[in-house]
Amino acid sequence: MILPMSSACLGQFLRASPRGMIEQFNRAPPLRVSIRGAAGVEKSLGLGRNAGSQQGMQKNQLQDKIRKQLREVQLSPSSYDTAWVAMVPVQGSHQTPRFPQCIEWILQNQHDDGSWGTNLPGSVVNKDILLCTLACVVALKRWNTGRDHISRGLNFIGKNFWVAMDEQTIAPVGFNITFSGLLNLATGTGLEFPVMQTDIDGIFHMRKIELERDAYGTASSRRAFMAYVSEGLGSLQDWDQVMAYQRKNRSIFNSPSAAAATVIHGHNDSALCYLDSLVSKLDGPVPVMYPQNAYSQLGMVDTLEKMGISNNFSCEISDILDMIYRLWIHNEEELMLDMGTCAMAFRLLRMHGYDISSDGMAQFVEQSSFDDSIHGYLNDTKALLELYRSSQIRCLEDDLILQDIGSWSARVLQEKISSKMTHKSEMLEVEYALKFPVYATLERLEQKRNIEQFKTKEQLKIEGFKLLKSGYRGAITHDEILALAVDEFHSSQSVYQQELQDLNSWVAQTRLDELKFARLMPSITYFSAAATMFPSELSEARIAWTQNCILTTTVDDFFDGDGSKEEMENLVKLIEKWDGHGEIGFSSECVEILFYAIYNTSKQIAEKAVPLQKRNVVDHIAESWWFTVRGMLTEAEWRMDKYVPTTVEEYMSAAVDSFALGPTITSAALFVGPELSEEVFRSKEYIHLMNLANTIGRLLNDMQTYEKEIKMGKVNSVMLHALSHSGGGRGSPEASMEEAKREMRRVLQGSRCDLLRLVTRDGGVVPPPCRKLFWFMSKVLHFVYMEKDGYFTADGMMASANAVILDPLQVTLLPSGLGTL
C-alpha cells in the first residue's frame, strides 16, 4: 500500500534519526480499562488488575447465554398490551373474557408498590410504568376482579400522576393518546383517581393538542400513526380506515393492543385469529410487537458484528441469515413492511454473500416512502440511518434503486442536522454516518466506538422506548455482550501491542531504518491490518500485511527519486532473478538493504505458510514483487525522460501495478484459512480482484496528490484526463481539472461496485476469506485517502492507530452489571 504524497505531514510525529525516520513508539503500558460509573463495577465485571480475564463470569458462560438468545427469541412481556388483550370479550358474551390467562398474569405480576411494567428498584417512575399500570387497572375493572390490585394500582397512579404531565419525561410512542384513552375508559367504568380534576382535564387537553397539531410527516403518515395508536382513540377513530393497515397475519402493525382494540370496538373479528395464535403460543402475557423474530434476530446479529464478537457465533448467525433469506425471497411482511428491518436485512444478507437484488428495496426509492409512514411522522432517525447505510452496499454502478435511496436519505439526514430536529446522541450518529460511508470504515475502530457507546440493560430499561407504544427492551443479553466484547477487545490489544513490538524489531533487523529516505511508520501501517483483520488468531496475516506495506512504501520512495536510474534497474533485475540474485550483485548498499529486506521477509512468510498451504508459495510473493517494481520503474523512466503518456489507459497500465498491493494481499492471503492452489493465484478472478483493488488505490491517490505530483514532474490520471478533454487548449484549466476529478470519481465508484460484487458473490475460485482481504484493503484506502475535512492528518491517523492498539476502553457500566448469572 502506498501512503499518499500528502503524508509528508506525517513528519510532524516522526523523529529524525541517523538511521532514517522511524516513528516514536514506546513500550505500551500494562493493559487497563477505564470505567466510568458507580463503585464496585470492576468487581462485578471481573475487570480488576487483570483486565483480560473474566472473574465474575467465565467466557464460555457469556457465550452460552448469548448463543441461547440467538437460537431462540425470548419475547419480553408487555403489561400494556397484555391488558388490552385481556379486555377482549368472548364473542356474543360481553360479560366473559376471551383470554382469562391474560387476566391471571396481570394478577400475578403486580409490583409491591402497586405498579405494573418494568419497575426498577430505586429508580424514578416513568411514563411507561404509569401507562402499564393504568392499562392493567382498567383491564381488571372491566371484569370486576382483583379489587385489592385495583386499589393499590389507583393509589400508585395518584401518587405519580404528575409524571404524565411532565413533558420533559421520556415517553412511549403516542403516550398522550394512549394514556388519555385509557383514562377515558377508566372514568367511564366508575374508577376514581386520587387526583385533582384539573389534572385529569390537563391530560385530555394534551390529547386535544396532539390531535390538532400539525405532525412532522404528511397526512398519510398521520393516518398511519393514528391507526397504530387506535386503541387510544376509541369512538374518535375511523375504524374502517384502520382496517386498511391490517396485515396478512390479521394484526394492525403487528401490535397486539391495536388488534385487541379493533375487536373490542366490533370492527375486526378476523383479528381474533391473530390474538388466539399469540395467546396460545405464549399462554398469558403478550409482547409489545408480534411477530418479532426477524426484527430481534437481525438486531442481535448486527449488534454482535458491531461489537466485534460475531466470530464466536458463526454457526448461529449462519442459521439466522438463512432464515432471513427465506423470508426475503418469499417477500414476507414481517421483514419487508418495516423500513429499518428490511434495510438491515438487505445490508447483512448482501455483505454475507447471499444472492439478492435490490428489487426488495424498490419500495423505498421515493422519499415519500419515509414521509408518508409512521417513521416519517415520528421523525425516526434510526430507520432512516439504516436505509442510508444499506444504500451504500452497491454491487452495480447503475443500480438506480440504491442510488436514489442514498440520494434522498442523505439529503434528509443532512436536513436533520441543519434543523437540529434530532436528539444530541442521534445527531452525532447522523454526522458520523454522513462523514464515514460504509466503504470507508474500519471494523476495529468502529467496534471500539460501539463498545464505548453500548448501553447496559439498566440504561436500556430507562431509554429503550424507541418506536413502540410500550417500553420494548427485548430479552437481548446486553450485559453479557458488553462483557464479552470488553474482554476480547482487551485481549486483542495485548496481542496487537506485542506484534507491534515484533515489527519494530523486524525493521531494525532488516536495516530499513538505515535508509534516510524511508518513511517508516510501523504503528500506523500495522493499524491498517489490526483494524480490519482484528481476530487474534490472524496474527501472521497482520504481520505479513504490515511488513509488505512498509516495504512497498519504502520501495516507492526509492523509485520516486531517492534512487538513481542505475540503482532502480539493479533492484528490478535482482527481484527478477530472485534466488539467482548472486549472479548480478548490488550497485549500492541501499539496493542491497532493500533487496534483502524484500527477499528474506518473503522467504520467512512463505516458510510460515507451509503448514497451512502444504507447499512453498514464495514464487507467488516474488512474482507480485516483480510486477510491482516493473510498474514503478516504468513510471520512474517516464519522469526522468519527461515523457507524458498519451492516454489514461497507457498510464494505468503501469500505475495499477505500481500501487503495490500485490505483495501485501498475496502474503496476507496465505494465513486467513483456506489452502490456496496454483489455480487460485493464476485465476482470472484473482487477477481481476487485484486489478480492481490497485485501481481503487491509484485513483484515490491521484485525486488527492495530483497538484503535488504535477510540481514533481510526475504524471497522474487526473492530469492526463484533464489534458485529453481540454479541447486543444480551449476552456478553463480549472474547469478541465474539475471535470477530470468528477470522471475519476465515477470510475472509482464503478471499480468499488465491481469489487464488492466479486467479494460478496456466491461461488468463485478464490475462497471468500481471501476475497474479503481485497475489500478490507479498499476500506483502508478510502479511510486513508478520505477527502472530507482533511481527516488524513498526523494527529488523526495516530489517534486512530492508538485507539485500536494502545488506548484503554472508556466504558460506562452500572452496578447491577452481570449479577444475573
UniProtKB/Swiss-Prot annotation:
GO molecular function ontology, one term from the record: terpene synthase activity
Enzyme class name: lyase
Chain positions recorded as Mg(2+) 3 binding sites: 701, 705, 709
EC number: 4.2.3.30
Effect of residue 664 to I: Changes catalytic activity. Converts syn-copalyl diphosphate to aphidicol-15-ene and diphosphate
Positions occupied by motif DDXXD motif: 556-560
Entry-linked InterPro entries: Isoprenoid_synthase_dom_sf, Terpene_cyclase_plant_C1, Terpene_synth_N, Terpene_synth_N_sf, Terpene_synthase-like, Terpene_synthase_metal-bd, Terpenoid_cyclase/PrenylTrfase
Co-factor remark: Binds 3 Mg(2+) ions per subunit.
Pathway info: Secondary metabolite biosynthesis; terpenoid biosynthesis
Cofactor: Mg(2+)
Leader sequence residues: none
Keyword field contains Lyase: yes
Residues reported to bind Mg(2+) 2: 556, 560
Known role: Involved in the biosynthesis of ent-kaurene diterpenoids natural products. Catalyzes the conversion of ent-copalyl diphosphate to ent-pimara-8(14),15-diene.
Family: Belongs to the terpene synthase family.
Domain notes: The Asp-Asp-Xaa-Xaa-Asp/Glu (DDXXD/E) motif is important for the catalytic activity, presumably through binding to Mg(2+).
Protein name: Ent-pimara-8(14),15-diene synthase
